[in-house]
Amino acid sequence: MQIKLQQVFPNFLEENKISQSGIWKKEIVFNPQELVEIVAPSGSGKTSLVHFLYGLRNDYSGQILYDEKAINQFNAEDFSTYRQSYLSVVFQDLRLFGDQTVRQNLEIKRLLQPYHHHSPIEMMAARLGIQNKLDKPCKTCSYGEQQRIAIIRSLLQPFEFLLLDEPFSHLDENNRKKAMQLIEEEAAMRKAAILLADLKPIEYFNADKKIFL
């Protein structure tokens, strides 16, 4: 899968922020297996970019293409199917089900969009230090624990592009490194690309390309 941005910019963003950007109003191509770091200060449209790429919002000008097809040319059913097969995401606001247990949040994703033949939930939870939280309601977990839950959830489905919006903002350095290693391993297994957007560079992300939004 390849993603192209053709002169894309948010309709609400100030012109000076657009003109200084390495993405807005540019011709940008994200290629298969590419590891891309997007460094984006507050107010530059980082979360909007993730939402645009995932097809959640359309308040922008220009075109976003999946494999040469503009996403606004997909009908709703085809777009949903395509996204389930090729895109996974960790949103900045996580979007977990607070009243459900951690395990239930993860099993829903694994069963609805299966990728692994055997459940890796226990293994991934152990690697990220939340194995003792699996049977507790998500809302009782700290925000840092919830970020790790959202990361694991994103890795349980098929994807060729993984979109990450400030995925480590509430993690200490040790847990950031563990999470990044797991993410890179899962992406490599799928020969998938990673687009990681954050406020500042992540030194332990082995990016092929760095773009300043």
Where would I find each of the regions flagged by the language model?
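Helix-to-loop junction immediately C-terminal to a conserved catalytic motif
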Residues: 54
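Conserved ABC transporter NBD signature motif
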Residues: 62-73
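ABC ATPase NBD coupling module
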Residues: 71-88
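Conserved ABC ATPase "signature" region
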Residues: 118-133
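Q-loop/switch helix immediately C-terminal to the Walker
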Residues: 93, 99-112
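Conserved ABC ATPase signature
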Residues: 137-145
